[in-house]
Amino acid sequence: MAMATRTLGFVLPTSLSSQPSFDRRGGGFRVSVIRCSTSPLTFPTSGVVEKPWTSYNARLVLEDGSIWPAKSFGAPGTRIAELVFNTSLTGYQEILTDPSYAGQFVLMTNPQIGNTGVNPDDEESGQCFLTGLVIRNLSISTSNWRCTKTLADYLTERDIMGVYDLDTRAITRRLREDGSLIGVLSTEQSKTDDELLQMSRSWDIVGIDLISDVSCKSPYEWVDKTNAEWDFNTNSRDGKSYKVIAYDFGIKQNILRRLSSYGCQITVVPSTFPAAEALKMNPDGILFSNGPGDPSAVPYAVETVKELLGKVPVYGICMGHQLLGQALGGKTFKMKFGHHGGNHPVRNNRTGQVEISAQNHNYAVDPASLPGGVEVTHVNLNDGSCAGLSFPEMNVMSLQYHPEASPGPHDSDNAFREFIELMKRSKQSS
């Protein structure tokens, strides 16, 4: 009978190639249990496991006057941002690297974060854009075959603050009842609570152009370097190629990945790229991407959208949806606490079907302000807010949520096929 081997403790592999394998000599399995961690756990004489990260006393001070003692991980210092909560159970690395979170602290309602570490494949952009991460418990151990480092090390390297050991459930209830709040995270004991409170009350995220901080600086051709295992819904394609210009207001990699998988050749352009220059490139369609902040803070983007309407088919996602709403003559407004998570039910008004969607936005389009001919195609079933638009006369479609997910369900991936069909019909009629 074959003997199973077991590795005890925590191994620091430079390569995570070790896998459970079949032992042909003995007819059984040889099992190795691997834990990825940048530092081994130690067991002092007290029997308490020491945390493998540097921790400081920290505070979260909110503009409503509440003070939440915490422990820190990641970078030390003092930062100010808007606090929002995210209800996703998984995908914290995608959330960390989503440019739409620029200017915000993200509180995860899932009580245990960090279990799977981080890896290069799950990033949605080249850096972390959120200001800080707020969690209940930071996992002591990290276990995943793709893991290359711990969450604490990852945040430290990117100069992002993280705090844990707070009552995140109580904070979430406060945000749900009172709305999003400006807060200050600090590890600096020399600063008084009153000083931090005054900081939180002297700053506002409304009206700030955050898109210019996250957009690319020059156009580039997007080449998908992702493992083919990411792909799905391959039977939905017609084998044709479509040239798409993607306006980068804070675009996520998986939006580009999904477009590419449907046969699109993508040129990504900055948020300030002139509409006339975009049209000179003779695209089959234009995508207006997701992005952070207030759509009213970027009138230059609204003007660009207006200039492109009716010229080629356009597709807006999240911020792109809001900019389209304004360009069509509608108004946007700031929501009480926004939608952030991977479990939001949305009804497709055309089919009656309900999709579970990934969402991340603090603003919404007021459907009552839209002109005639603009159809509200999707509605959020939690609060009845507008979740999708269509204006067939100008070949316009948009979604307030994220059909590419990452993280989140894939219920809405069909929206990319609908954009392909929109471009296809436009080419056939021209």
UniProtKB/Swiss-Prot annotation:
Disruption phenotype: Reduced plant size. Reticulate leaves with reduced number of palissade mesophyll cells.
Species assigned in the record: Arabidopsis thaliana
Highest taxon of the lineage: Eukaryota
Transit peptide: 1-35
Any one biological process term the GO annotation gives: cellular response to phosphate starvation
GO-annotated cellular components: carbamoyl-phosphate synthase complex; chloroplast; chloroplast stroma
Annotated active site: 318, 402, 404
Cell compartments where the protein resides: Plastid, Chloroplast
Boundaries of every Glutamine amidotransferase type-1 domain copy: 243-429
Name of the featured protein: Carbamoyl phosphate synthase small chain, chloroplastic
GO terms of molecular function: ATP binding; carbamoyl-phosphate synthase (glutamine-hydrolyzing) activity; glutaminase activity
Biological function: Small subunit of the arginine-specific carbamoyl phosphate synthase (CPSase). CPSase catalyzes the formation of carbamoyl phosphate from the ammonia moiety of glutamine, carbonate, and phosphate donated by ATP, the first step of the arginine biosynthetic pathway. The small subunit (glutamine amidotransferase) binds and cleaves glutamine to supply the large subunit with the substrate ammonia.
Subunit structure: Heterodimer composed of 2 chains; the small (or glutamine) chain promotes the hydrolysis of glutamine to ammonia, which is used by the large (or ammonia) chain to synthesize carbamoyl phosphate.
Induction remark: By phosphate starvation in shoot.
Pathway: Amino-acid biosynthesis; L-arginine biosynthesis; carbamoyl phosphate from bicarbonate: step 1/1; Pyrimidine metabolism; UMP biosynthesis via de novo pathway; (S)-dihydroorotate from bicarbonate: step 1/3
Root EC class: ligase
NCBIfam families hit by this protein: CPSaseIIsmall, PRK12838.1
Membership in a protein family: Belongs to the CarA family.
